[in-house]
Amino acid sequence: MSTDNKQSLRAITLAAIGVVYGDIGTSPLYTLRECLSGQFGFGVERDAVFGFLSLIFWLLILVVSLKYLSFVMRADNAGEGGILTLMSLAGRNTSARMTSFLVIIGLIGGSFFYGEVVITPAISVLSAIEGLEIIAPQLDTWVVPLAIIVLTLLFAIQKHGTGLVGKLFAPIMLAWFLILAALGLRGIMGNPEVLQALNPIWAVHFFLEYKTVSFVALGAVVLSITGVEALYADMGHFGKLPIRLAWFTVVLPSLVLNYFGQGALLLKNPEAIKNPFFLLAPDWALVPMLIIATLATVIASQAVISGVFSLTRQAVRLGYLSPMRIIHTSEMESGQIYIPFINWLLYVAVVIVIVSFEHSSNLAAAYGIAVTGTMVLTSILSTTVAYRNWHWNKFLVALILVGLLCIDLPLFSANLDKIVSGGWLPLTLGLVMFIVMTTWKSERFRLLRRMHEHGNSLEAMIASLEKSPPVRVPGTAVYMSRAQKVIPFALMHNLKHNKVLHERVILLTLRTEDAPYVHNVRRVQIEQLSPTFWRVVASYGWRETPNVEEVFHRCGLEGLSCRMMETSFFMSHESLIVGKRPWYLRLRGKLYLILQRNALRAPDQFEIPPNRVIELGTQVEI
């Protein structure tokens, strides 16, 4: 590897540390405290400490190192990852029925992420600022207000992008992990016997010793791997090698050292259970630790917010969410986007959660169920990809799936016990998002099918118009068409009411490909249907934003020139009414009407000059 390549790899690896590992990197703030807080019927006992440390270590090895970094990350769509990408890959070579099943699994996984994303900023920032209770116990009433202030500032700066402050993420998080390692070493040196917990026999002994209670306690151990999905979701930003390199050289050693350092401290001083992370530090370092812990949790929250923006854009482009305003905050990096509606909706939800739960320990009960649910779904989808796409031996795939589920299902089942004490929150949020996504997709399909079910043949209509043309007016008319072989509603209504046709007519279809990006060579396909009719199909990836001016620039390069200020864009605007249907479908229809009314209009969605747009209304019953 050349010197330049090595330097580039180091830079990308450092950047990955700053973004990808924020969530899992701040888990030591609260994980061991929740494991040994006494809620499971046992306190800070030697067997319990060793058992939990062994479970945490082997979860980091089996789930993060083996499952995600070695297996799941093999499944990429042009380098991109994430649960919806995995869903798309899994459904490529399957039957229609199987594809529908896999789509449901993928949407549930995406919905779980929306449920989790509300909790992550709240529990992360709260757990950091709770260090104030160690420094100055009399200021404990300020924890919630300070957490809200920090998160308010974080959400407020989203519209300006993270390009400038993002450059600080990597060095801050690198410093954070080095501090984790140093504090952990300090604790281990005081009680080296804690390293015995590296032996998996202590995890087995934990289950034998504490029996039924040990299974429920798995729900707390899961806190150590929250954020593991980010490794796969952010693969497109950094690549597989930098993410893997960052984990094995910096993140994993730092996490293991810190967890074992906390364990060593608790064996010497069981009273440190009130906050073993901060009490691991010397007194003089508490204030600096509070500051850098807060910065680290803000960065972890930023990574989650950016993740929900990316997931939302992908869902919009794939047709699972209604179009909404997406603002690019960087001219250099297409992945840096801002979605105002999602940003402020998430902010309100996070503030409500902080005010309602007040303490990170209360929120810990709500955390984990969405994470483990997504892990189960990821196992199913990734093994489907291995069998269908990679053509692995079915017995090997079955063995891998059984092995993965032997880990995932107990973790998920253990978290079901949390539903009453807080787990209902991510489940409810996830259910709402699942209903919204399936409603938009299915009702949109019903609407388009109803609009086109009585349509005449496009070829026959064009032939008729060429044979007996109506009055022709100068200029070019562009009719937006959702389907290539269907007569656009706007064209039919223009002929019906205005009884004129432009000299040149272009039927434009904007299509989303099953890929993050589409090369410019494949951007535009032009087909001349008659002397005065053309069909243009423009293809975009789900990480790209369609732009009509760019489309016609590409058309001009291929011989079909259009001047935007001499072109009229005709679009149909549907006024929807809910027809006779069962009560539950009426409710879904009304939800769709609400989503439709608040959706971004096509001219704004496709960046068409508003003074060149003509909308023709039509009423459609759904």
Swiss-Prot record:
Its main location: membrane. One of its GO terms (molecular function) is potassium ion transmembrane transporter activity. GO terms for cellular component: plasma membrane. It catalyses: K(+)(in) + H(+)(in) = K(+)(out) + H(+)(out). The chain crosses the membrane at residues 12-32, 49-69, 101-121, 134-154, 163-183, 213-233, 247-267, 276-296, 337-357, 363-383, 395-415, 419-439. It is found in: Cell inner membrane. Keywords: Cell inner membrane, Cell membrane, Ion transport, Membrane, Potassium, Potassium transport, Symport, Transmembrane, Transmembrane helix, Transport. Signal peptide: none annotated. InterPro entries: K+_transporter (IPR003855), K_trans_C (IPR053952), K_trans_N (IPR053951), Kup (IPR023051). It holds the Pfam family K_trans. It is a multi-pass membrane protein. Belongs to the HAK/KUP transporter (TC 2.A.72) family. Responsible for the low-affinity transport of potassium into the cell. Likely operates as a K(+):H(+) symporter. This is Low affinity potassium transport system protein Kup. The gene is kup.
